[in-house]
Regions:
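A short helix-loop
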Residues: 48-49, 54-57, 62-152
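Short beta-strand-loop/turn "lid" adjacent to the catalytic site in phosphate-handling enzymes
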Residues: 1-18, 22
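Acidic, glycine-rich active-site loops and adjacent beta-strand->loop/helix elements
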Residues: 1-6, 32-38, 60
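Short, well-ordered alpha-helices that flank and scaffold nucleotide-derived cofactor binding pockets
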Residues: 18, 22, 40-44, 92, ...
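Short, acidic/small-residue loops that bind anionic groups at enzyme active sites
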Residues: 17-38, 78-80
């Protein structure tokens, strides 16, 4: 991809893609990483423009109106940390594996989502922005106050995931 992303990963991918295109005698076409995510729903559906998109990745959290190829309107975004970062940090605090998303999901299915009341930042604001830094801090505080038993991990994962859903979908 042409960006955005981690510079080392982009450099390796760019070098490989250029060499591969040359070896195959094909043109090299740079693609924006986020645009790839934004257009992926059209790969296996007859989705028409415009459509709403919730774009969540390791470094980005946005609501977009996809108007057409290359034309996007940002309706909301994170004002601090990306959701993927919050999932990875929570998984790390709970001593789960990486990437955090699948690990949190696995534990959350067996936990009590109502055990821990975590903050819902910006939920009453009249915009579509997110904030996940406070949620990460709240999880860290609760983890520091408890023994990290399997039950605790399941309940915290469920509470975290439930809270994230409340933030995104309210």
């Amino acid at each position: 991809t042409a960006g955005p992303g981690l510079i080392v990963c982009l450099s390796v991918g760019l070098s490989f893609a250029k060499a591969f295109a040359t070896a195959m005698n094909k043109p090299f076409i740079a693609v924006n990483h986020l645009e790839g995510h934004a257009l992926s729903p059209k790969l296996n559906t007859n989705l028409n423009y415009p459509y709403l998109l919730l774009l969540i990745s390791g470094g980005h959290s946005q609501y977009l109106s996809v108007q057409n190829l290359g034309k996007y309107k940002r309706l909301g975004t994170t004002i601090d940390d990306a959701l993927g970062e919050a999932f990875d940090k929570t998984a790390r605090l709970l001593k789960l594996g990486y990437p955090g998303g699948p690990e949190i999901e696995k534990y959350a299915t067996l936990g009590n989502k109502n055990r821990f009341k975590l903050p819902l930042p910006l939920i009453k604001e009249k915009n579509s922005h997110f904030s996940f830094a406070g949620l990460k801090s709240a999880v860290a505080k609760v983890v520091a106050e408890h023994r990290c038993t399997e039950k605790f991990k399941r309940d915290m994962a469920a509470s975290f995931q439930y809270t994230v859903n409340q933030i995104i979908f309210n």
